[in-house]
């Protein structure tokens, strides 16, 4: 890691935990993310003030279920799983609250790098980002004049389509897809609610 830093590296990520490497990085103010898959390794990382660790290989050491179990006693720790993460399970990983980030070799295959196929790599990265954010329409918002009208609209939709009615404080829902506000709002034309796997990541876009 000393050679990497001498060559300009601003952070170090290691597949496993090395006390020597972690101590040197902390002492020299170099960001370090060590691989930790056991309580002992996580506690060692925490003793140096670290809050993010790598979990590798994730598919071998239990994946999400293992990290979820570890996040119980180590609630302040976030994981970066690599190994077994791909475009098929990316959304499941990234939406877990104890996941800081993920890594996957499918984004930058050695063959694509060697062939300078950067357009393909860029496309894969964009698709991964889209999957990670997981934008979907959550519901459509409709404005009603008052609480009585709001409930009447929801009941009409339920009668027509069997959506079901859920009454709330400031609005009522017809199923999960239509929200009818009880009073007028500044957004006079209603609203469209979009959900995401991660609000902080979405806000950074």
Residue map of PLM features:
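Catalytic beta/alpha-barrel core
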Residues: 1-2, 8-18, 31-42, 51-59, ...
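Catalytic cores of alpha/beta
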Residues: 1-7, 40-49, 65, 71, ...
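N-terminal beta-strand motif that seeds the catalytic metal site of vicinal oxygen chelate
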Residues: 129-154, 187-194
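C-terminal helical cap(s) of enzyme catalytic domains, especially alpha/beta-barrels
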Residues: 25-30, 111-133
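Glycine-rich phosphate-binding active-site loops on the catalytic face of alpha/beta enzymes
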Residues: 16-21, 54-64, 98-121
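Conserved, mostly hydrophobic/aromatic
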Residues: 4, 25, 53, 93, ...
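Core segments of cupin and vicinal oxygen chelate
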Residues: 141-183, 201-202
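Mid-chain, well-packed structural core segment of small domains
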Residues: 185-205
């Amino acid at each position: 890691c000393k050679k990497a830093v001498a060559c300009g590296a601003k952070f170090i990520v290691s597949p496993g935990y090395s006390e020597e490497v972690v101590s040197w990085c902390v002492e020299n103010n170099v960001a370090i993310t060590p691989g930790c898959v056991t309580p002992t390794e996580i506690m060692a990382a925490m003793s140096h003030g670290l809050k993010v660790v790598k979990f590798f290989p994730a598919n071998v050491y239990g994946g999400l279920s293992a990290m979820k179990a570890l996040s119980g006693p180590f609630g302040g720790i976030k994981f970066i799983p690599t190994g077994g993460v791909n475009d098929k399970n990316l959304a499941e990983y990234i939406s877990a609250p104890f996941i800081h980030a993920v890594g996957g070799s499918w984004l930058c295959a050695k063959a694509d790098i060697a062939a300078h196929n950067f357009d393909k790599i860029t496309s894969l990265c964009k698709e991964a980002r889209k999957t990670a954010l997981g934008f979907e329409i959550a519901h459509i918002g409709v404005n009603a004049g008052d609480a009585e009208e709001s409930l009447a609209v929801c009941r009409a939709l339920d009668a027509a389509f069997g959506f079901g009615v859920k009454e709330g404080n400031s609005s009522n829902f017809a199923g999960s897809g239509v929200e009818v506000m009880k009073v007028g709002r500044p957004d006079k034309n209603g609203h469209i609610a979009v959900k995401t796997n991660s609000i902080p990541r979405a806000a950074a876009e």
